[in-house]
């Protein structure tokens, strides 16, 4: 049995109106990604995307705008370089201007999840500086503490930090 090595692109979907995030589904992101690869890399990109790329939107959180895209290891740069060409997503007849911010490239879903926890904790710490009232600060501190406790519990049970990010050339 052959194992296909994959890369996971953890992206942040940035939109002008956060209320429009609930409109998106994974197939909308997939179609936009397919079109972007076609525009950026032409016939070669379209052929690679359809035949060998193995692109799949594994996770889309409509509340936070986090997208996890899986693609083959040999061609992940093709997808990665096409992300800036996505300027809007269209769903149910509505076009929403957006862009993708790739925040992590990992070898497994697990390493991407670990990075996302660390990233969210950093974002919460930045939010703490912007809080104006003591109640807001207390809520953000509780959120930071809950992220930290979950991370510590996960590291105690895991024991390994190997993410398999080595590349074959």
Curated annotation (Swiss-Prot):
Keywords: Nucleus, rRNA processing, tRNA processing. Its main location: nucleus. GO terms for molecular function: ribonuclease P activity; ribonuclease P RNA binding. GO terms for cellular component: multimeric ribonuclease P complex; nucleolar ribonuclease P complex; nucleolus; ribonuclease MRP complex. Signal peptide: none annotated. InterPro entries: Pop5/Rpp14/Rnp2-like, RNase_P/MRP_POP5, Rnp2-like_sf. Pfam families: RNase_P_Rpp14. It is found in: Nucleus, Nucleolus. One of its GO terms (biological process) is rRNA processing. It comes from the Eukaryota. Component of ribonuclease P, a protein complex that generates mature tRNA molecules by cleaving their 5'-ends. Also a component of the MRP ribonuclease complex, which cleaves pre-rRNA sequences. Component of nuclear RNase P and RNase MRP ribonucleoproteins. RNase P consists of a catalytic RNA moiety and 10 different protein chains; POP1, POP4, POP5, POP7, RPP14, RPP21, RPP25, RPP30, RPP38 and RPP40. Within the RNase P complex, POP1, POP7 and RPP25 form the 'finger' subcomplex, POP5, RPP14, RPP40 and homodimeric RPP30 form the 'palm' subcomplex, and RPP21, POP4 and RPP38 form the 'wrist' subcomplex. All subunits of the RNase P complex interact with the catalytic RNA. Several subunits of RNase P are also part of the RNase MRP complex. Belongs to the eukaryotic/archaeal RNase P protein component 2 family. This is Ribonuclease P/MRP protein subunit POP5. The lineage of its organism: Eukaryota, Metazoa, Chordata, Craniata, Vertebrata. The gene is pop5.
């Amino acid at each position: 049995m052959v194992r296909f090595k994959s890369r996971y692109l953890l992206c942040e979907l940035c939109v002008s109106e956060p209320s429009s995030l609930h409109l998106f589904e994974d197939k909308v992101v997939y179609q936009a990604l397919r079109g972007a690869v076609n525009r950026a890399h032409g016939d070669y990109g379209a052929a690679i995307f359809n035949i060998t790329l193995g692109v799949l939107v594994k996770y889309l959180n409509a509340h936070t705008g986090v997208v996890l895209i899986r693609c083959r290891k040999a061609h992940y740069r093709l997808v990665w370089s096409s992300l800036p060409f996505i300027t809007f997503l269209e769903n149910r007849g509505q076009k929403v201007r957006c862009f993708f911010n790739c925040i992590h490239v990992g070898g497994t879903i697990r390493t991407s999840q670990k990075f996302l926890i660390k990233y969210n904790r950093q974002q919460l710490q930045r939010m703490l500086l912007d809080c104006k009232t003591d109640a807001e600060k207390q809520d953000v501190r509780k959120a930071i503490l809950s992220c930290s406790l979950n991370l510590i519990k996960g590291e105690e049970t895991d024991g390994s930090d190997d993410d398999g990010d080595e590349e074959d050339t």
